[in-house]
From Swiss-Prot:
Subcellular location, record wording: Cell membrane
CC terms in the record's Gene Ontology section: plasma membrane
Domain statement: The VTT domain was previously called the SNARE-assoc domain. As there is no evidence that this domain associates with SNARE proteins, it was renamed as VMP1, TMEM41, and TVP38 (VTT) domain.
Membrane topology of this protein: Multi-pass membrane protein
Superkingdom classification of source: Bacteria
Keywords: Cell membrane, Membrane, Transmembrane, Transmembrane helix
Chief location: membrane
Region (VTT domain): 73-183
Family membership noted in the UniProt record: Belongs to the TVP38/TMEM64 family.
The UniProt record lists the keyword Zinc: no
Protein name: TVP38/TMEM64 family membrane protein YdjX
Transmembrane spans: 7-27, 50-70, 72-92, 156-176, 192-212
Amino acid sequence: MNAERKFLFACLIFALVIYAIHAFGLFDLLTDLPHLQTLIRQSGFFGYSLYILLFIIATLLLLPGSILVIAGGIVFGPLLGTLLSLIAATLASSCSFLLARWLGRDLLLKYVGHSNTFQAIEKGIARNGIDFLILTRLIPLFPYNIQNYAYGLTTIAFWPYTLISALTTLPGIVIYTVMASDLANEGITLRFILQLCLAGLALFILVQLAKLYARHKHVDLSASRRSPLTHPKNEG
């Protein structure tokens, strides 16, 4: 199957998925959490699979995953919610990465090769490798879901990408899940406000540590965002 046919096939699959989501009202479940909780409790393993599937589809369609992480915290609680969201987020980012690889670099460069995000990511990987991946996962320089596709077009290997994505996603997932679960169960209390402040402080410290790591490794994130990419490297 050539690149153009792959692209048309992928568009057809996306269209069918969107139609099925609309027809079965799957995303409506996210705005009706009591119904979603009941459905999952009655469905057992299928309910967990449904949540993971929704997460993957949302990520492929570039919808914000934080909404689903919050829903997971409310529906599943802090521990199971964190585990399921981590599994779902890891599978989702891997699917986006592999889809970009499958569609092919030459085809996708026609559509995204000129974008500042892709140019910055490819130049950063070429210069700094894994360090750049770690930093862009921790520091919100680019939209997270777009990164998944962009990294699929670079020379980075699949398994390091997947492992690092999972590890760097975990802190945010834990915070969102725990806070959502506590808010759903107890409402806005003094304890919740204190936890919210501590969570914000923890994320701020994490970002600052990532910036210190960037300086230690001599990773110039600002320069990589400004510079255009004129000679992309081929897969090797």
